[in-house]
Amino acid sequence: ASTVEYDTYEQPDGYFTMQIPKGWAVQTGGDFISYIIDVYDPAQPQREIYIQLCGTGFQSAEGAALAQNYNASGETLFVMPEATTLSYFEGWYQGLGGSFQLLETLGGEADNALLYGKATLPNGTQTEGVYSAVVSSLEYNYGINLSMTMGQNVRVLTTAPGELDAWLPTLSACADSIQFSELFQNKRAENWSQVLGTSASLSASWNAMTDQMMARWEARIRQ
């Protein structure tokens, strides 16, 4: 990882730019609220930077089952019983057909934690990584529990087991380099206003997130 060369990636619609290791692939998805950036090494896909600006899950299986009846898009509906960072990732991986195991909480509160863990992907592949998300609860009960868990600024930085120490600085630097354009931020604010009746913008500081992540990780190594 110390000899990594970088390219500047420019999203074709002008939504963002970022630095990525030379030869890595970038995929994007979601709408302006849930926007996803997935950066990975085609030769070693466990090396991955996954960013999602907003993701949600239902706090009850009954709520998810009811919503599935109206889920015309065919998207996976996750069950995340608690509004915590750990519950978010446990529910996310389980919904994808895998699993998540917490190894250590590196810092933060339960709803805004920095986690060190390992995951099993649906195909059985093992990964090791650092995970963070700012999580809140959207309360809604109407006979059954339709409350939702919402994760914002979701960040997943992973490698094959045993590689994280070598690769985390590179993964963090790339995630930190993301620059969203004014065009994207304006479109996202418009979407938030339509959905929630309020305005929202990208308030997270990527620099602050990366500084915290690396400081916590280095403190763990020194122990």
Where are each of the predicted segments found?
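Surface-exposed amphipathic alpha-helical segments
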Residues: 24, 153-197
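N-terminal low-complexity, Pro/Thr/Ser-rich intrinsically disordered segments
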Residues: 1-9
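Proline-anchored loop/turn motifs at beta-strand termini and strand-loop-strand connectors
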Residues: 13-31, 175-181
